[in-house]
Curated annotation (Swiss-Prot):
HAMAP family named among the record's database cross-references: Asp_carb_tr_reg (MF_00002)
Biological-process GO terms, alphabetical: 'de novo' pyrimidine nucleobase biosynthetic process; pyrimidine nucleotide biosynthetic process
Protein name: Aspartate carbamoyltransferase regulatory chain
Oligomer and partners: Contains catalytic and regulatory chains.
Chain's role: Involved in allosteric regulation of aspartate carbamoyltransferase.
Cofactor(s) listed in the protein's UniProt record: Zn(2+)
Gene (UniProt): pyrI
């Protein structure tokens, strides 16, 4: 008989980002500026997962992520789920899908890009090449980079 015990405290109301790949939880906290709130945030790192082997989880009380925020999670956590909780019950489960653009959360690898020298939010257009590799094109400097290159700059 398997005992199912919560390893991260339940929240009464808010958003739960589950199935985050291990070691990505802290990165999401800073990139999405989740810590710039007065809301209580609980994070579980390197937890056991049947689906991923290991996972991270983030719970944000009294905050419901927008569809735009959820979809931008997909660049880092394509198999994540976002659960909306009300009165300790799951009321909605959302699966992120890659948006056409990623705004504000990524840094352009081009050191000459205007976004690296002025207070301008970054913006990338997601593109797929002929080999189905995901590339990101900066809206400002118009340079195109492999997804892996952009994510390594963060």
């Amino acid at each position: 008989m398997e005992i199912n015990k919560l390893q991260v405290e339940a929240i009464k109301s808010g958003s739960v980002i589950d199935h985050i790949p291990e070691y990505i939880g802290f990165k999401l906290l800073s990139l999405f500026r989740f810590t710039e709130t007065e809301k209580r945030i609980t994070i579980g790192l390197n937890l056991p997962s049947k689906k991923l082997g290991r996972k991270d989880i983030i719970k944000i009380e009294n905050t419901f992520l927008s569809d735009e925020q959820i979809n931008q999670l997909a660049i880092y956590a394509p198999h994540a789920t976002v659960n909306y909780i009300n009165e300790y019950n799951l009321v909605r489960k959302v699966f992120p899908t890659l948006p056409k653009t990623i705004d504000r959360i990524l840094i352009c690898p081009n050191s000459n890009c205007v976004t690296n020298h002025h207070l301008i939010n970054s913006s990338f257009i997601l593109k797929e090449d002929q080999f189905f590799n995901m590339n990101l094109k900066c809206k400002y400097c118009e340079k195109e980079f492999y997804k892996k290159i952009v994510l390594s700059c963060q």
